[in-house]
């Protein structure tokens, strides 16, 4: 049998017990319990503040949660673009079928003179109207696709935090807060930072290709700093490929001149800003931007390797 520790009143529960009358009539007991309650509330508020800070940091994009959510948004948007592209292709096929049918009917009407002119004219007008409607629908889908691509690519650039740095004279651009590697000064970076920077660039280019060109590029992961030449070669080749597809460089661009003027980091930054890169042209196409030619340039521009 449990009794009150002050008045001795019986209590059957197997817990430490003080009756309500004694709590209210004993200042020492009441003060102790109130102090415990205040301490408990303070601890709860501290835990609540810590949880809110963690959630705010995570959803703001600085923590792991924010990164995963942003990555999920990009992949969801990419799926929407793929579906939109499929709808666009179906609309194009439908328009082409209408045009083929229209041409076939025109040929039949021209070879069979017994068809009445009124019927031929009516059929021709109907087919032209259908073709015009399908073309308008195709144009609408094309505009929607282009707009969504621009929005998704802008979000991609914000996610990777590609920025120009005015404080560093050696590395003018950053990605995810790290110096963006370049041919001129890449050897000055710590090997681990260089590899991390290259990995971010590779991930950025992979997603950019899927947004603009709906195709994947070389997904061989960059694991260490032993194949620096191959890593630089692949990154430069992919960057030039998407720059040419986006018409941000001349079709006959001189790869030597553009690397001297902008280097890899400058090319990536101009791509993120959708800015045209002016350079000399290789009109004779004597040095096309192939993997082998780019590799030779990389080897000549990094004398320390």
UniProtKB/Swiss-Prot annotation:
GO cellular component: phagophore assembly site membrane; protein-containing complex; vacuolar membrane
Changes seen on gene knockout: Still forms preautophagosomal structures (PAS) in proximity to the vacuolar membrane.
Keyword Ligase tagged: no
BP-aspect Gene Ontology terms: macroautophagy; protein transport
Domain of life assignment: Eukaryota
Pfam families noted in UniProt: ATG14 (PF10186)
Chain coiled-coil ranges: 34-147
Record keywords, A-Z: Autophagy, Coiled coil, Membrane, Protein transport, Transport, Vacuole
Membrane topology qualifier: Peripheral membrane protein
Alphabetized InterPro entries for the sequence: Autophagy-related_protein_14 (IPR023261), UV_resistance/autophagy_Atg14 (IPR018791)
Localization (cell): Preautophagosomal structure membrane; Vacuole membrane
Transmembrane segments: none
Miscellaneous comment: Kluyveromyces marxianus proteins are shorter in length and have a more ordered secondary structure than their S.cerevisiae counterparts, which might contribute to the superior thermotolerance and solubility. K.marxianus could be therefore useful as a new model organism for further elucidation of the molecular details of autophagy.
Free-text note regarding domains: Coiled-Coils at the N-terminal half are essential for autophagy.
Role according to the record: Required for cytoplasm to vacuole transport (Cvt) and autophagy as a part of the autophagy-specific VPS34 PI3-kinase complex I. This complex is essential to recruit the ATG8-phosphatidylinositol conjugate and the ATG12-ATG5 conjugate to the pre-autophagosomal structure. ATG14 mediates the specific binding of the VPS34 PI3-kinase complex I to the preautophagosomal structure (PAS).
Complex formation: Component of the autophagy-specific VPS34 PI3-kinase complex I.
Protein family membership: Belongs to the ATG14 family.
Name of this protein: Autophagy-related protein 14
Classification lineage: Eukaryota, Fungi, Dikarya, Ascomycota, Saccharomycotina
Name of encoding gene: ATG14
């Amino acid at each position: 049998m449990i009794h009150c520790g002050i008045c001795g009143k019986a209590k059957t529960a197997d817990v430490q017990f003080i009756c309500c009358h004694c709590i209210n009539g004993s200042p020492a007991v009441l003060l102790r319990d109130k102090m415990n309650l205040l301490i408990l509330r303070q601890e709860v508020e501290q835990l609540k503040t810590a949880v809110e800070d963690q959630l705010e940091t995570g959803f703001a994009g600085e923590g792991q949660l924010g990164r995963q959510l942003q990555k999920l948004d990009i992949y969801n948007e990419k799926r929407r673009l793929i579906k939109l592209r499929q709808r666009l292709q179906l609309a194009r096929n439908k328009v082409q079928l209408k045009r083929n049918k229209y041409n076939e009917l025109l040929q039949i009407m021209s070879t069979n003179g017994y068809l009445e002119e009124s019927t031929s004219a009516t059929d021709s007008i109907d087919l032209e109207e259908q073709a015009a409607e399908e073309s308008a629908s195709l144009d609408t889908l094309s505009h929607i696709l282009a707009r969504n691509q621009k929005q998704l690519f802008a979000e991609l650039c914000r996610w990777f935090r590609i920025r120009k740095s005015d404080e560093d004279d050696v590395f003018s651009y950053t990605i995810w807060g790290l110096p963006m590697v370049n041919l001129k000064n890449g050897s000055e970076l710590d090997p681990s930072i260089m590899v991390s920077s290259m990995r971010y660039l590779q991930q950025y280019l992979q997603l950019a290709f899927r947004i603009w060109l709906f195709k994947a590029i070389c997904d061989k992961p960059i694991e260490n700093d032993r194949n620096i030449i191959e890593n630089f070669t692949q990154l430069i080749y992919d960057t030039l490929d998407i720059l040419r597809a986006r018409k941000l460089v001349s079709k006959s661009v001189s790869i030597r001149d553009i690397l001297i003027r902008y280097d890899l980091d400058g090319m990536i930054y101009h791509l993120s800003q959708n800015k045209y890169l002016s350079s000399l042209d290789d009109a004779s196409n004597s040095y096309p931007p192939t993997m082998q030619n780019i590799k030779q340039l990389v080897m000549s521009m990094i004398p320390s390797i």
